[in-house]
Amino acid sequence: MPFLTGVEIYDFRLRRELSRTIYDFRVNYKSQIVNHKSEMFVMFTGIIENLAVVKKLSLKAGGAELLLDIGDFSDEIKLGESIAINGVCLTVKEVKGTVAGFDISRETLTKAALGKLRNAEKVNIERALRVGDRLGGHFVTGHIDGVGVIKEKKQHADQCTMSFSVEKRFTDMMIEKGSVAIDGISLTIVDIADCVFSVALIPYTLTSTTLGHKKTGDQVNIEIDMMGKWVKKILKKENYGGITREQLTEQGF
């Protein structure tokens, strides 16, 4: 029986680990969604339900307080419910009329682009996924990985292309045609180059989310697709005997 080459061993181990990861990923997320009512975990899909208006953002010791006019949503949400605000999972602490209040921790202010919200500015909102809901986008946790900056915005006849500058650790976990959440919006990656990636926005997305009002230089919240994080973790953890990227390319990987 012939010995396996280093590349064949790499291929076998990678496929094995990816299979395990995908299985664990599905089981884990299924249990997280089922346990939503017990508040063990919440998930979102990146499909924006409505736009809310900032009434007031008050910075205070340990974080901030955010007041939003959520309109008709005030009849549906409950105290303690989790809502994604521009992609950031926040808990409803009070509802007075159509205005809902949220506390923002210092860590969240550091990671996300919520601290610069201005009065009357619009934000994307999405309620947590419920058992039985359709998954129109992709699994979004509401835990932001960091902030990106709009580098370029090009308007075409029937769509808009927008590119974002991010840290390289973000693009290392992205693939073309993969998913990414930008300000809580589930979008498909069109192109990736070093520390920049781009997405295409259809007219509906431009009119029903905040991205239609964004301009070059504006900050946005970025959440990388969970699968990309898992794959990077596996590749970082495993030792493949010094096989180089060039060797893998030669073998067709």
Question: Where do the PLM segments sit?
Answer:
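Intrinsic disorder/low-complexity segments
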Residues: M1-V42
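Conserved loop->alpha-helix
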Residues: F41-F253
